[in-house]
A protein has these predicted regions:
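Phosphate-binding site of ATP-dependent enzymes
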Residues: 95-194
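Conserved N-proximal alpha/beta basic substrate-recognition cap immediately N-terminal to
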Residues: 1-67, 72-95
Length: 194
């Protein structure tokens, strides 16, 4: 059946998870601190910025990076994510073709730190490795990164889906941004619905 967000939260998330764990689950940097030591593969964090004064180093930090992703640590629904796929004439190029100078990136990261895209009043901006999807998935969409979400309940997988980016989602695999969700059969891994 379709597990809506409200049904998921009210029927599974809130009754079966300790409230004290929510801040960790909602913070990408804290999750990385927990998952990395136990060997979970993660995109490399190049830099993180929690305070505005740290942005004075941004141009130096980005000097050697041509591809990266900027995201809010506590963001949701894909908001605030900028995917950079290259650099030309002193500007970075987004996956959607938009060009970003250093001042535009500073403004965007300042918005993230200010909390524009987060659950809280203040946030941290993450600059991390851009992960490239396997070429076999390029037939679905070749300008983004499809992912797989597995819903666990009491340590057992109960549902799975692949989130596939679209032109409407600007290459992001986020349903709120216009990506497509494909239901996956847990036994075969084949798509069972969309």
């Amino acid at each position: 059946y379709v597990l809506t967000m409200n049904r998921r939260n009210l029927g599974y998330v809130y009754p079966y998870n300790a409230r004290r764990d929510f801040p960790v689950a909602n913070d990408k940097l804290l999750c990385k601190e927990i998952l990395a030591p136990v060997g979970v593969p993660l995109a490399k964090t190049h830099f993180s910025y929690r305070y505005f004064y740290e942005l004075k180093n941004l141009e130096r930090d980005l000097a050697t990076l041509d591809e990266f992703v900027i995201k809010p640590s506590q963001g949701s629904a894909g908001n605030g994510i900028v995917v950079i796929v290259g650099r030309k004439d002193g500007e970075w190029i987004g996956i959607n073709g938009k060009r970003y100078g250093i001042d535009a990136l500073k403004r965007h990261i300042s918005d993230i730190i200010f909390g524009v895209y987060s659950f809280d009043n203040q946030d941290a901006a993450i600059i991390e490795q851009r992960v490239i999807q396997h070429q076999a998935l390029d037939r679905l969409f070749d300008r983004g990164l499809a992912d797989v979400r597995i819903i666990m309940f009491q340590h057992q997988p109960i549902q799975a889906m692949s989130r596939v980016p679209t032109l409407a989602s600007d290459g992001k695999a986020n349903l709120h941004q216009g990506a497509v969700g494909l239901g996956l059969d847990l036994k075969s891994g084949c798509c069972s619905s969309a």
